[in-house]
Amino acid sequence: MIEPASGDTDPLTIDDAARAWVERMRDTMSIEEKVGQLFVFSTSQDSREELAPLPALKPGGINRFPKPDLAAFRDATMFAIESSNVPPIFTGDIEGGTISYPFATAVPNIMGLAACDDLATTEAVARLVARESRVLGYDWSFGPVVDINSAFRSAIVGTRSFGSDPDRVLAQASVYARVLQEEGVAACLKHWPGDGFDERDQHLVTSVNPLSVEEWHELYGRIYGSLIRAGVMTVMSAHIAFPAYIRARMPDAGREAFQPASVSRLLNEELLRGELGFKGLIISDATGMGGLTSWMERSEAVPALIENGCDMFLFSRVPEQDYRLMIDGLRKGLLSEARLEEAITRILSLKARLGLHLREPVERLAPLEQMRAGLQQSADVRKANAASGQSITLVKDVQDLLPLDPIRHRRIVAVMEEGFSFWDGALGRGYDPIIGELTQRGFEVRSYDPDNMPTREDTDLVLYLVGQEATPSAAHIYLDFVKLHGTNRKAMTQFAQEIPTALISFGQPYYLFDAPHMKTSINAYSSIESVQRETARRLVGEAPFTGVSPVDAFCGLEQLKW
């Protein structure tokens, strides 16, 4: 357990013995070893072969995207621990939903938690996530997301956020971050200086926070400031511009006003550290993103990230190349020795704050069967199932369709679009769980056939099941009727006036924008199995809808309400 900070306490404060370890390690490292510590490299294959080249670079951290084989995951992680003379920190995008780790308890995503509208539920889920993360060897969660989902068309914020209400975002994130750190997992606020007002995705372009400085302080400044005072350990500096702040300091700024925060000294050092008082560690967002790669040449970007305020460098397409570019940047003066020393001190202090320097490998990663015993415990599964049910939100039912009845609505045509995940170890996205639950209750469910479209004579209900959660590089998320119905011409056919029709989103909560004619709409936020099963129970009236929408599912349009 990490003791909570208070007031303006440095979240990386450590005792004298830990400080002596930090100073000894820092002062005995070569320049090459210090440069290696700046990097958090990404792995996704759970193999020693994938990890084998990394020890030579001596990275400070390793991000783990696991595959479903727990034994292989453990073996690869232990190999990384045993191959490092400085304990590596293990990181992960631990956000729930369909990117819940395959051998851990699947939990609702962040927006699903917000829809529960119950901080006790958020605390319970965050605690089980943190405990399972520790079982798996994770030390640092890249979360919670504290973006405000103002732009409903944003394909990258949406279900990764706590919603559009800044007060709700702050309340939920405060609980989530506190619990992570109580359980020994460093929390990370993202995406600095704040996403959610631009419809675009920083994975593809340098997106923009368009707020005035005054508006920003009322919203993001309040959120970050409160969580910094509460002792959050780390912040992720994103490839997002904040031109109003830059121009307040540089009135004549042209292109420079749209510089990504990740390489902006003004945003990282003056605003985050100077004005908000953050004393923890700043890590860049993933450096392969278009928001950075479209801004500057790689040889300049690599040292610029550290020189301009980031303490760690996240992900590399070619680790050896970026390592060499960092060394070259130091030799050419693009990265100062002072910034390198400052960054290394914070990196080692974070590791010491988490107690990594005190743990033997077996203390960081238990034997395989002990790991299995610590995952998907029955009490945790019950908590996750309860949260899944609590989150499901009835947006509208103006046709009084619900509850479904196996006599009146026996013949169901399911029109399905599963969506995709950004890594191949994510949970499956099919709809077998909800279809199975309906079938068990006496319904006959058949898949939509574009060559045999449903009619009044053969169909009692058309049920749209869509499920794209907010996802990197998706660009736009919408109801693609061409894909759903099979052809451009058939996309124009809508069934709602002829056959009872309902829309269930197991992803983004804004699909009504593309289908205002849907008279029954449900938002379930993610397609994990427990959410699907709990949705089926609510469809037939076995449990009430209790979810409270964290966003305006009507997208500000009165037309969508009817």
Each model region followed by its residue ranges:
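Second-shell residues forming the walls of enzyme active-site clefts
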Residues: A72-S83, T98, S164-R339, R346
